[in-house]
C-alpha cells in the first residue's frame, strides 16, 4: 500500500534529503571539482554537430547533458566501434569516463539538486524582478517623455511671450536690447512733451494750495512738484547733477552708450541667440563679479573745495535717464494724480452741502476756470505718462541706458527661458532612447527567462525520474519553491 504513495520532497530541502537518505555523500563537492576539470578539457574536442552546439549553448553542463552527448557520439563515432562493442574514439572514452565519475556515489544527483535549488530560489526570481523593473522603466520613460514635452512647450511659450513683450526678435538678444535702448532719447522727448502738456495741471495745483492757504502759501512751504516744474521749463536740458546739488555743472561727461552699441555690432562672434549646443552651466567668471546695482558717480566736491564742477556717470544723465531722478518724477506724477482725482471727486459730489458751499464761495480765476472736463483730461494724461514709464520693456531699457552692463543680466534671464525649451527637448529625446533600450532589455530577458524556465522544468522531471528509479518506480513530486518559481510562466 505504501509503495503506491508518492514521495513528496520540498525543493529547498532536496539536497539535504538526498544526503540524509544516504543517496549522496556530504563531501560530494570534492568529486565535482575533478569532474568539472574533465568536462573543461573534453568539450574542446567535439564533433561538428548542430545538436551538440544547441545542447551546449549557454548551458551549465550537468550529468544529463553528458548522457545526451554520449548518445550523439554513438552516431558520430560509430566508425570507431570494434566488434566487441567498445569505441576507440578518445572523445567517446572521455565522456564515458565523465559519466562514470558522475554516477559514483550519485554525485550527479547532488549536483543536479544544487543546480535546481539555485535556479528556483535565486536565478529565476531575480530575472523576473529585473524584467518587472525594466517594465517600470519603460512606463516611467513614457510618462517623463510626455511631461518633458509639455515643459518644452511651456518654455517656448514663456520665451516667445517675453520677447514679444519686450519687442525683440529673439535672435541676437544683446544687440537687439542695446538697439532698443539706443532709441530711448526719442521716447524721453515724447515723455518730456507730455509732461509739459500737464504744466497747467501743476499750476492749478499751486493755485489751489494758495487758495486754501487764504491767498498765498507760507514762505517756508515746499515747492509744488519741483521736478515736473523743472522739466516743464527746461525739458531735457537738466542734468541729475544740477537737480541734486542745485548747481549747473561746468562740464558734462555722459557714458558713451553709442560706443557700447558699436562694439556689440562689431562682435559678430558673440551670438547669444544661435548655436546648436545648449550651455546649462554657470555664466562666465568675469560676469559673476559685476555688481549691476553699483553706480559709480564722479562728481565735483560739494564740501566747498574750489574746482571745476564735473557731472559724470549717472549724474551726467538727464532727469528721465537717471533711475533715481525718474523715480522722483513718478512720485510727483502720482501725487498730482491723487490731487486731481480728489478735486474731481469734490467737483462731482452732489450733496446739498456741497452745492451750497460751491455757490457761496468765491474762487480765484486760476481755480474757478478749471472744469470737470478739464480735470478728467488731466487725469487721463497723467495716467498715460505713468503707464508709459512703468512699461516692463521700458523699465529694462531704462536700466540698460543708465547702466549698460545691466544688459548682460537681462540677456542671461532671457537665455534661461529660451534654453528651457531646448533642455526639455533633449531630455525628451533621452527618454525615447531609454524607452527603446528598456524595451529591448525586456524582450531579451523574457527570452532568457523562458529558456531558463524550460530547462529548469526538464531538470525537475529528470531528478524526479532518477529518484523514482531508486524507489522501484514510485512517483516522486518536487514541490514548494520550484513550483512557485515555474508558476509565473
UniProtKB/Swiss-Prot annotation:
Q: Name one Pfam family in it.
A: CDK5RAP3
Keyword Methyltransferase present in the record's keywords: the answer is no
Keywords on record:
Ubl conjugation pathway
Q: Indicate yes or no for the key word Repeat.
A: no
Coiled-coil regions listed: none
Record GO biological process = IRE1-mediated unfolded protein response; regulation of cyclin-dependent protein serine/threonine kinase activity; regulation of mitotic cell cycle
Cellular component, GO annotation: endomembrane system
Briefly, what is this protein's role?
A: Substrate adapter of E3 ligase complexes mediating ufmylation, the covalent attachment of the ubiquitin-like modifier UFM1 to substrate proteins, and which is involved in various processes, such as ribosome recycling and reticulophagy (also called ER-phagy).
Question: Its family?
Answer: Belongs to the CDK5RAP3 family.
Name by which UniProt lists this protein: CDK5RAP3 protein homolog
Amino acid at each position: 500500500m505504501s509503495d503506491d504513495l508518492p514521495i513528496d520532497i520540498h525543493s529547498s530541502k532536496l539536497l539535504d534529503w538526498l544526503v540524509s537518505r544516504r543517496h549522496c555523500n556530504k563531501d560530494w563537492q570534492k568529486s565535482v571539482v575533478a569532474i568539472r576539470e574533465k568536462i573543461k578539457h573534453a568539450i574542446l574536442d567535439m564533433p561538428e554537430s548542430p545538436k551538440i552546439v544547441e545542447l551546449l549553448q549557454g548551458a551549465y553542463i550537468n550529468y544529463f547533458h553528458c548522457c545526451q552527448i554520449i548518445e550523439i557520439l554513438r552516431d558520430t563515432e560509430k566508425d570507431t566501434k570494434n566488434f566487441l562493442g567498445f569505441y576507440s574514439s578518445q572523445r567517446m572514452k572521455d565522456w564515458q569516463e565523465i559519466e562514470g565519475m558522475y554516477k559514483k556515489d550519485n554525485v550527479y544527483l547532488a549536483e543536479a539538486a544544487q543546480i535546481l535549488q539555485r535556479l528556483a530560489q535565486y536565478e529565476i526570481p531575480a530575472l523576473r524582478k529585473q524584467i518587472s523593473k525594466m517594465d517600470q522603466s519603460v512606463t516611467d520613460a513614457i510618462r517623463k517623455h510626455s511631461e518633458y514635452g509639455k515643459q518644452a512647450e511651456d518654455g517656448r511659450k514663456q520665451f516667445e511671450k517675453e520677447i514679444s513683450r519686450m519687442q525683440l526678435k529673439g535672435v541676437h538678444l544683446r544687440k537687439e536690447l542695446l538697439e532698443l535702448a539706443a532709441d530711448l532719447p526719442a521716447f524721453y522727448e515724447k515723455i518730456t512733451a507730455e509732461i509739459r502738456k500737464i504744466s497747467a495741471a501743476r499750476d492749478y495745483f499751486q493755485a489751489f494750495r494758495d487758495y486754501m492757504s487764504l491767498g498765498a502759501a507760507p514762505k517756508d512751504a515746499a515747492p509744488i512738484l519741483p521736478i515736473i516744474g523743472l522739466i516743464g521749463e527746461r525739458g531735457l536740458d537738466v542734468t541729475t547733477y544740477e537737480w541734486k546739488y542745485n548747481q549747473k555743472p561746468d562740464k558734462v561727461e555722459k557714458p558713451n552708450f553709442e560706443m557700447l552699441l558699436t562694439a556689440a555690432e562689431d562682435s559678430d562672434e558673440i551670438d547669444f541667440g544661435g548655436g546648436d549646443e545648449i550651455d546649462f552651466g554657470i555664466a562666465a567668471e568675469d560676469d559673476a563679479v559685476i555688481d549691476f546695482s553699483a553706480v559709480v558717480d564722479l562728481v565735483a566736491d560739494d564740501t566747498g573745495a574750489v574746482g571745476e564742477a564735473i557731472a559724470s556717470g549717472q549724474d551726467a544723465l538727464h532727469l528721465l535717464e537717471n533711475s533715481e531722478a525718474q523715480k522722483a518724477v513718478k512720485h510727483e506724477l502720482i501725487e498730482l494724480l491723487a490731487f486731481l482725482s480728489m478735486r474731481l471727486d469734490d467737483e462731482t459730489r452732489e450733496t446739498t452741502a456741497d452745492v451750497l458751499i460751491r455757490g457761496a464761495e468765491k474762487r480765484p480765476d486760476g481755480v474757478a476756470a478749471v472744469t470737470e472736463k478739464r480735470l478728467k483730461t488731466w487725469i487721463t494724461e497723467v495716467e498715460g505718462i505713468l503707464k508709459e514709464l512703468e512699461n516692463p520693456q521700458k523699465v529694462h531699457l531704462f536700466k540698460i541706458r543708465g547702466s549698460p552692463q545691466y544688459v548682460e543680466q537681462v540677456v542671461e534671464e532671457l537665455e534661461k527661458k529660451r534654453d528651457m525649451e531646448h533642455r526639455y527637448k533633449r531630455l525628451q529625446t533621452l527618454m525615447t532612447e531609454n524607452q527603446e533600450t528598456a524595451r529591448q532589455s525586456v524582450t531579451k530577458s523574457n527570452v532568457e527567462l523562458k529558456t531558463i524556465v524550460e530547462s529548469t522544468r526538464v531538470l525537475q522531471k529528470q531528478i524526479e525520474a532518477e529518484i523514482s528509479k531508486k524507489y522501484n518506480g514510485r512517483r516522486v513530486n518536487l514541490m514548494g519553491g520550484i513550483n512557485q518559481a515555474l508558476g509565473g510562466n
